[in-house]
Amino acid sequence: MQLNPTEKDKLLLFTAGMVAERRKNRGVKLNYPESIAYISMLLMEGARDGKTVAQLMSEGATYLSANDVMEGIAEMIHDVQVEATFPDGTKLVTVHNPIV
């Protein structure tokens, strides 16, 4: 399988998101990179499922709570941005204050 650099980046981000999801499901509090990867993975999957940018921007703030992450992580993450592939092309999705 031949992947271009963008596809490799998306695959790596998705893989990191899957690891973070498994840890979250086991009750492990996520660190900074795991939190970013988890939110990004769900945004990319939502885009592939046909959700709109507006839907993902509002839903993205509900994926993680302060109880899901290590102490201080919620305050460190102000925005999460990911280029997601929608049925009509690639768009930038930005979620402000993603961890409440």
From Swiss-Prot:
Biological-process GO terms, alphabetical: urea catabolic process
Keywords, comma-separated and alphabetical: Cytoplasm, Hydrolase
Entries under Gene3D superfamilies matching the protein: Urease, gamma-like subunit (3.30.280.10)
Major enzyme class: hydrolase
Subcellular locations according to the entry: Cytoplasm
Tree of life domain: Bacteria
The EC number(s) this enzyme carries: 3.5.1.5
Gene Ontology annotations for the cellular component aspect, listed alphabetically: cytoplasm
SUPFAM superfamilies per record: Urease, gamma-subunit (SSF54111)
Keyword Transferase: no
Predominant location category: cytoplasm
Catalytic activity entry: urea + 2 H2O + H(+) = hydrogencarbonate + 2 NH4(+)
Acetylation as UniProt keyword: no
MF terms (GO), sorted A to Z: nickel cation binding; urease activity
Pathway membership, UniProt: Nitrogen metabolism; urea degradation; CO(2) and NH(3) from urea (urease route): step 1/1
Family in the record: Belongs to the urease gamma subunit family.
HAMAP family the record matches: Urease_gamma (MF_00739)
Assembly description: Heterotrimer of UreA (gamma), UreB (beta) and UreC (alpha) subunits. Three heterotrimers associate to form the active enzyme.
Protein name (record): Urease subunit gamma 2
